[in-house]
């Protein structure tokens, strides 16, 4: 994945995570944009080299009457109000609901997934893990018209050159008939489909797996799953290798060399005293691995310890390449494990180093119901912790003598239930 793409995906991930976990939290007014300048920009783009694969008729057809969407410019420059602790991130992305839905999807599509594995080498549960984290198994595809968003970002704001490439690719998708115009919707940054591809990624990795002549990653689950596997295969996924596993560190272990990229042979980790989380010997399923400690240096609330630790291999890197975040990759990895292991619980063997763990979506809804019962105007109890919910949380935290940071955690939920 090229650096501009990774940077945009990283930015989009931060905001998408904020929207997913905290809801719509941005109240800033969008800037005014000059529609005449927008039309002039589109006219210049039509004849540029970046759009040489889009014919004049298609360009006109898909941009005629198009108006800019200034709200995407706010999102382009917006930073999350605060960084989510990893335990909050994982609590929402890998909760009982998503695991149950993932196991159902895994069972429903197992024949298709096995055929995809035969062709790409990517394990079925890993593909399902990506699907679950990216769109909640197709339930959250985003609702912004890609052509409008990408056209706006191509003409205003930062990184116009990058977005022009994505805009051209989006028009080409429509020109070739892979996706219907009304179905080409997604995130503000241009990601779309069941597993949220950028348009340029579509042309590198999208697959027509159902044989209908179109690479439809929006409405064709087989196409979307096969395309996801193709992306991971292109990123270097190794057939038959696990992404890694949770481990137990020996007392007093020096973690200064921890890091996903600091790989050592598995035997070296054995000699250093590491075991699997249950105390058994490390398996030989990975030739080498790096030590990932997501919460190192991030303990909270007086809790000690390092939290869960993992040895991760090359296949973890392919998950990281999908969205340039170790927490994101870990969410996929854990979800993929649970999908393939019925009966396993969502918690890691080692608890997170906090005395106030995060909430699942069901617990978020319970928290919101309690806030509604106390008279707070937060809309519905939908499990999305947005701006209104966070303001209500701050009010209740102040009343309860807690730090008014707007964070939804187990302590606040317990206090409101008393």
PLM-predicted stretches and their roles:
Residues 23-27:
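Sec/Tat signal peptide C-region and signal peptidase I cleavage site
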Residues 357-364, 372-416:
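Short acidic, glycine/serine/threonine-rich helix-capping segments at coil-helix boundaries
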Residues 88-233, 243:
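Acidic/His-rich structured neighborhood in mature extracellular/periplasmic domains
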């Amino acid at each position: 994945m090229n650096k501009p793409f990774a940077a945009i995906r990283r930015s989009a991930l931060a905001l998408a995570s904020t929207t997913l976990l905290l809801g719509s939290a941005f109240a800033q007014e969008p800037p005014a944009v000059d529609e005449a300048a927008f039309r002039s920009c589109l006219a210049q783009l039509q004849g540029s080299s970046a759009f040489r694969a889009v014919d004049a008729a298609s360009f006109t057809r898909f941009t005629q009457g198009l108006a800019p969407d200034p709200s995407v410019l706010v999102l382009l420059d917006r930073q999350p109000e605060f960084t989510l602790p990893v335990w909050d991130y994982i609590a929402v992305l890998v909760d009982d609901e998503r695991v149950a839905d993932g196991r159902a999807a895994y069972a429903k599509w197992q024949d298709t997934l096995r055929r995809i594995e035969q062709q790409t080498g990517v394990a079925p549960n890993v593909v399902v893990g990506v699907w679950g984290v990216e769109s909640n198994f197709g339930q959250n595809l985003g609702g912004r018209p890609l052509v409008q968003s990408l056209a706006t970002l191509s003409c205003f704001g930062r990184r116009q050159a990058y977005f022009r490439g994505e805009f051209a690719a989006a028009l080409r998708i429509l020109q070739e008939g892979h996706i219907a115009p009304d179905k080409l919707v997604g995130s503000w940054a241009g990601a779309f489909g069941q597993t949220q591809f950028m348009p340029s990624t579509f042309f590198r990795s999208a697959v027509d797996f159902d044989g209908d002549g179109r690479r439809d990653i929006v409405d064709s689950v087989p196409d979307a799953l096969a395309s996801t596997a193709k992306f991971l295969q292109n990123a270097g996924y190794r057939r038959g290798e696990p992404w890694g596993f949770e481990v137990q560190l020996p007392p007093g272990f020096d973690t200064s060399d921890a890091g996903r990229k600091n790989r050592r042979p598995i035997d070296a980790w054995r000699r250093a005293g590491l075991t699997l989380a249950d105390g058994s010997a490390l398996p030989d399923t990975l030739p080498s691995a790096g030590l990932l400690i997501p919460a190192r240096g991030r303990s909270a609330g007086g809790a000690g310890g390092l939290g869960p630790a993992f040895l991760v291999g090359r296949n973890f890197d392919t998950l990281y390449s999908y969205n340039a975040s170790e927490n994101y990759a870990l969410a996929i990895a854990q979800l993929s494990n649970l999908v393939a292991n019925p009966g396993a619980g969502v918690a890691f063997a080692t608890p997170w180093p906090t005395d106030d763990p995060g909430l699942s979506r069901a617990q978020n809804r319970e928290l919101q119901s309690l806030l509604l019962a106390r008279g707070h105007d937060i809309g519905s109890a939908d499990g999305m912790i947005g701006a209104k919910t966070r303001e209500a949380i701050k009010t209740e935290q102040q009343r309860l003598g807690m730090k008014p940071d707007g964070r939804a955690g187990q302590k606040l939920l317990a206090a409101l239930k008393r």
